[in-house]
């Protein structure tokens, strides 16, 4: 008796543990039957007020590059959309555990029937029977491949037949069954493959997210430098307008004194009008750049920040390190850090798991089967005896009920034991063979993809490094051109004052100076863009900017 009870505990222990793991929270059923939440609450832009400062002309947003990128990471809509891809991949892991979810079921029916008697052995002229079966079962697939079930069934039967010893008759049965694969689907290594695949795909998604965010951060930083360039270009054009106004005023005084021909006044007037147009165009470009910057950091979503001026603290500094880049070192760093290359390599891990899954599908299906049932019988017992005259006599009634049936069932005195082996062997499993072939082809294809990405990484870094070197030289030459433009203007002004030159050449020198200053701004920003692009191509942009993806 004790050994049978111990056997019962061993058999039922997995089901009890499974139930505990399935319902870890008291709110389980509340979550199941709760109304689904379909309304989405979008958060308002955050932390914008942290960078508000009071200036002479009112409040403004003062942003360094770091503070601006912090706002971009907090409020950029495209980055928020990209992050959701990770949630989908995490949900796929949860879904991969679903084959191991236990399943509980219950069934109760009540059937009453009246049938005419066809023989005296039925014990009544009209047989009236009430049958009430109830069944409760619990089943689960374990990571080892074992599929087990535990079920309890009880049936209460009442009848008006005079030949029944039990009325009502209560029959109970406790059944344990299992199926253990021996070849196909055997062991945790095979049955947990979908979970491993989902986790590996999550890592692929995380690498792709990092690559996507890196591109979005690059776009956002380019918007920052667009605004810096527009701001400094406006300053250059305003300075050019001041020079044009000074030249026009001087020409007007000379015209009044008769030192200039009336026909020569049109050139400085035309020059001043051109400078005004350039200033208007620069202001328009500045407004456009500010609007683009607001979109990147989510300020356009908050009415309180849509029209607040933006003050950027970064400038167009001259590069100090003019030493050439070690291109091969940059390539090695890119091969180490590029997230798209990491994602491509991670896909190979997914392919290996897919091949293992396909190999398992092609194996023969050999399973060990087991079945054990313990039965019990109870109810009011009517002993029937036949006297010498052949009449059936009912003896004293022995009361009974469900307890008798359950005690007899747990006594394990009336068992049914069954063991067996089942083999399912497809003669030609073409679908599984095709799946295995496809998985092998996918592994080869993705291996070639890794090689292609490596080639692309190298080319990207070489191109980006060349752009950095070219930008350095362009900034250096722009400084030289600005120095010559300043000297040229000074020389033309002195010659004009001495009467050896005309106003046309002075105006031409002024325009050359404006063009040189504008070229210096453009080349300085182009250098910053090229450095930014190199960081993007080596995969170090987020680390360099101190950005951590949560």
Task: Put a short name on every predicted segment.
Residues 13-15:
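N-terminal signal peptide c-region/cleavage motif recognized by signal peptidases
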Residues 20-131, 178-193, 197-199, 224, ...:
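Bacterial Sec-pathway N-terminal export signals of envelope proteins
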Residues 80-84, 97, 143-171, 184-207, ...:
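Sec/SRP-type N-terminal targeting helices
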Residues 183, 260, 264-266, 301-382, ...:
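Amphipathic alpha-helical coiled-coil scaffold segments and their short linker/junction regions
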Residues 54-60, 108-176, 313-323, 356, ...:
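Small/polar, glycine/serine/threonine/aspartate-rich low-complexity segments that form flexible
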Residues 96, 206-330, 467, 491-494, ...:
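Periplasmic alpha-helical coiled-coil/stalk elements that build and connect Gram-negative outer-membrane
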Residues 2-8:
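Sec-dependent signal peptide recognition
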Residues 7, 18-33, 291-308, 314-321, ...:
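Acidic, low-complexity, intrinsically disordered peripheral segments
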């Amino acid at each position: 008796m004790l050994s049978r009870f111990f056997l019962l505990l061993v058999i039922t222990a997995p089901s009890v543990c499974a139930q505990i793991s399935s319902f870890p929270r008291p709110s389980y059923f509340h979550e199941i039957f709760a109304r689904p939440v379909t309304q989405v609450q979008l958060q308002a832009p955050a932390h914008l007020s942290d960078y508000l400062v009071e200036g002479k002309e009112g409040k403004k947003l003062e942003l360094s590059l770091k503070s601006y990128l912090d706002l971009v990471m907090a409020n950029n809509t495209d980055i928020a959309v990209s992050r959701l891809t990770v949630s989908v991949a995490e949900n796929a892991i949860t879904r991969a555990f679903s084959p191991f979810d236990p399943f509980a079921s219950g069934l109760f029916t009540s059937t009453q029937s009246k049938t005419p008697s066809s023989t005296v052995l039925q014990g009544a002229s009209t047989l009236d029977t009430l049958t009430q079966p109830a069944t409760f079962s619990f089943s689960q697939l374990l990571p080892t491949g074992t599929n087990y079930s535990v079920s309890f069934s009880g049936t209460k039967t009442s009848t008006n037949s005079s030949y029944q010893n039990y009325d009502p008759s209560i029959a109970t049965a406790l059944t344990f069954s299992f199926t253990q694969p021996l070849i196909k689907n055997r062991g945790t290594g095979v049955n947990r493959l979908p979970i491993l695949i989902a986790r590996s795909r999550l890592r692929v998604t995380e690498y792709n997210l990092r690559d996507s965010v890196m591109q979005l951060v690059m776009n956002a930083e380019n918007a920052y430098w667009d605004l810096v360039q527009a701001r400094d270009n406006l300053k250059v054009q305003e300075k050019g307008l001041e020079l044009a106004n000074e030249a026009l005023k001087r020409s007007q005084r000379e015209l009044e004194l008769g030192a200039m021909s009336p026909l020569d006044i049109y050139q400085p007037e035309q020059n001043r009008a051109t400078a005004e147009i350039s200033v208007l165009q620069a202001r328009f470009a500045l407004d456009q750049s500010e609007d683009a910057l607001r979109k990147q950091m989510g300020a356009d979503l908050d009415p309180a920040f849509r029209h607040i001026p933006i003050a950027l603290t970064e400038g167009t500094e001259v590069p100090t390190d003019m030493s050439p880049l070690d291109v091969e070192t940059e390539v090695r760093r890119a091969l180490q850090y590029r997230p798209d290359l990491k994602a491509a390599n991670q896909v190979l891990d997914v392919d290996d798991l897919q091949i293992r899954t396909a190999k398992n599908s092609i194996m023969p299906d050999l399973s060990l089967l087991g079945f054990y049932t313990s039965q019990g019988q109870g109810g009011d017992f009517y002993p029937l005896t036949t006297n010498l005259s052949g009449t059936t006599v009912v003896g004293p009634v022995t009361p009974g009920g469900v307890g008798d049936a359950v005690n007899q069932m747990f006594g394990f005195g009336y068992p049914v034991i069954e063991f067996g082996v089942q083999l399912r062997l497809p003669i030609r499993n073409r679908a599984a063979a095709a799946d295995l072939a496809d998985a092998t082809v996918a592994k080869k294809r993705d291996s070639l993809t890794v090689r292609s990405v490596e080639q692309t990484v190298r080319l990207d870094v070489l191109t980006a490094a060349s752009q950095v070197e070219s930008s350095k030289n362009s900034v250096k030459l722009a400084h030289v051109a600005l120095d010559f433009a300043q000297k040229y203007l000074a020389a033309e002004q002195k010659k004009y004052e001495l009467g050896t030159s005309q106003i046309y050449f002075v105006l031409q020198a002024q325009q050359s100076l404006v063009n040189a200053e504008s070229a210096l701004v453009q080349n300085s920003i182009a250098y910053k863009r090229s450095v930014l692009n190199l960081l993007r191509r080596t995969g170090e942009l987020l680390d360099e900017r101190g950005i951590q993806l949560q």
